[in-house]
């Protein structure tokens, strides 16, 4: 049944009867031309569905498939809005029937897009907030002047250059990082908390010297999760924090590390094991961004970025805890938030420790790159010998002849 009433988007004096309804807000319209003037609603709907899939495929595939199908047909259609997947009024069965109407090849292609973590390329580019006023050209100079540093080993890129990523086993990092982390406007820098308690007020005894090594692990998860969720969205707050706590053993499992390299490798292992999508940064890119955050804007305010990141984390975890229903989830979020507040107080009083941590992270970044290049070279050689990506079937070397 066609919707009753006039079109809500026709120019004054040219109002036509409405023949269709917007699938998102049910606004009446008469033609494809009028629907396109209402394009923001459709784009927002599409973005919500893609983000829903990125947060762990919790949204039913029928909703995202219908959005993709509708947008594709809309581009191909010029005159007949009915052919663009826009039915007259609510379609029988709603959106759930559109997934079944896709051909098997279309379903497989769409599922490959999600399984490879490439759906993020469909979203607008996003730029980390710590690139806004990064140290940039001074980065190498700071590392060179740091005690015990080896400038020949450390090659952190300028603040406006995408990370020099290599292929991980699970994703092609350079292309994804370049598209999602390109030179585009980014989010505003989070505000550093105005009241940071003294570390002695949060600890009953002496602070362990291993506390510092939890920072790289937490910041790795922070950079990875922000890039994966394109800066985060309150609608995805629960999933954002689930990814954060899943990648960071320091936040999610109260894990302790003996070195910065161990802390980074623990987080990288979670991604390499496939427990979470690699995201646009990948493991190398996330290590690179940890060093950037630890270096801050420069020597005059090196701890600023780390304080801002930890403060942002504490606020985010606090908001998620208020929304959580299950007691176990609330407890996990509470402990993670307390950990961030403790690291915030520690960082505020130990700014001098950030440069050595940044150096350790930069070395771990390069060591990971060397290993990745060696694996890629070995893989290429094996594929050359095999004549393809899989080894040939074993041949029988000795065969007993019948008597």
Swiss-Prot record:
InterPro entries per UniProt: Znf_HIT, ZNHIT2
UniProt: Zn(2+) 2 binding residues: 22, 25, 38, 41
UniProt KW keywords: Acetylation, Metal-binding, Phosphoprotein, Zinc, Zinc-finger
Superkingdom per UniProt: Eukaryota
SUPFAM superfamilies the record matches: HIT/MYND zinc finger-like (SSF144232)
Annotated TM spans: none
Database matches in Pfam families: zf-HIT
Chain positions with Phosphothreonine modification: 161
Residues noted as binding Zn(2+) 1 in the record, renumbered to the chain: 7, 10, 30, 34
Residues modified to N-acetylmethionine: 1
Positions of the UniProt region annotated as Disordered: 72-98
UniProt zinc finger (HIT-type) residues: 7-41
Effect after changing residue 59 to P: In a breast cancer sample; somatic mutation
Coiled coil: none
Gene3D superfamilies documented for this protein: 3.30.60.190
Tissues expressing this chain: Low expression in most tissues; highly expressed in testis.
GO MF annotations in UniProt: zinc ion binding
SUBUNIT field: Interacts (via HIT-type zinc finger) with RUVBL2 in the presence of ATP or ADP; shows a stronger interaction in the presence of ADP.
Functional description taken from the UniProt entry: May act as a bridging factor mediating the interaction between the R2TP/Prefoldin-like (R2TP/PFDL) complex and U5 small nuclear ribonucleoprotein (U5 snRNP). Required for the interaction of R2TP complex subunit RPAP3 and prefoldin-like subunit URI1 with U5 snRNP proteins EFTUD2 and PRPF8. May play a role in regulating the composition of the U5 snRNP complex.
Protein name: Zinc finger HIT domain-containing protein 2
Native species: Homo sapiens (Human)
Organismal lineage: Eukaryota, Metazoa, Chordata, Craniata, Vertebrata
Gene behind this protein: ZNHIT2
């Amino acid at each position: 049944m066609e919707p009753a009433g006039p079109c809500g988007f026709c120019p004054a004096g040219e109002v036509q009867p409405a023949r269709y309804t917007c699938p998102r807000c049910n606004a009446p319209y008469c033609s494809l031309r009028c629907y396109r003037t209402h394009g923001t609603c459709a784009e927002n709907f599409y973005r919500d569905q893609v983000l829903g899939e990125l947060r762990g495929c919790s949204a039913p595939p029928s909703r995202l498939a219908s959005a993709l199908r509708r947008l594709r047909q809309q581009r191909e259609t010029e005159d007949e809005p009915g052919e663009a997947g826009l039915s007259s009024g609510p379609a029988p069965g709603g959106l759930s029937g559109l997934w079944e109407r896709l051909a098997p090849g279309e379903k497989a292609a769409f599922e490959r897009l999600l399984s490879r973590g490439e759906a993020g390329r469909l979203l607008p580019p996003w730029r980390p907030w710590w690139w806004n006023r990064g140290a940039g050209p001074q980065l190498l100079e700071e590392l060179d002047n740091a005690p015990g540093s080896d400038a020949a080993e450390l090659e952190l890129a300028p603040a406006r250059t995408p990370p020099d990523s290599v292929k991980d086993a699970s994703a092609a990092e350079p292309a994804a990082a370049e598209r999602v982390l390109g030179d585009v406007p980014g989010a505003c820098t989070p505000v550093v908390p105005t009241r940071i308690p003294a570390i002695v007020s949060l600890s009953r005894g002496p602070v362990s010297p291993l506390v510092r090594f939890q920072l790289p692990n937490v910041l790795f998860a922070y950079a990875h999760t922000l890039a994966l969720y394109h800066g985060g969205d309150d609608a995805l707050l629960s999933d954002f924090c689930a990814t954060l706590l899943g990648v960071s053993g320091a936040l999610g499992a109260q894990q302790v590390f003996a070195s910065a390299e161990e802390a980074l490798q623990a987080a990288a292992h979670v991604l390499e094991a496939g427990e979470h999508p690699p995201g646009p940064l990948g493991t190398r890119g996330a290590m690179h961004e940890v060093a950037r955050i630890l270096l801050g804007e420069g020597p005059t305010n090196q701890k600023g970025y780390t304080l801002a990141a930890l403060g942002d984390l504490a606020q985010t975890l606090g908001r998620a805890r208020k929304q959580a229903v299950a007691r176990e989830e609330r407890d996990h979020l509470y402990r993670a938030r307390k950990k961030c507040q403790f690291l915030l107080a520690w960082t505020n009083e130990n700014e001098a420790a950030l440069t050595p941590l940044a150096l350790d992270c930069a070395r771990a970044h390069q060591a990971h790159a060397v290993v990745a290049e060696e694996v890629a070279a070995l893989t290429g050689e094996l594929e050359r010998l095999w004549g393809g990506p899989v080894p040939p079937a074993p041949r029988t070397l000795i065969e007993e002849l019948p008597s």
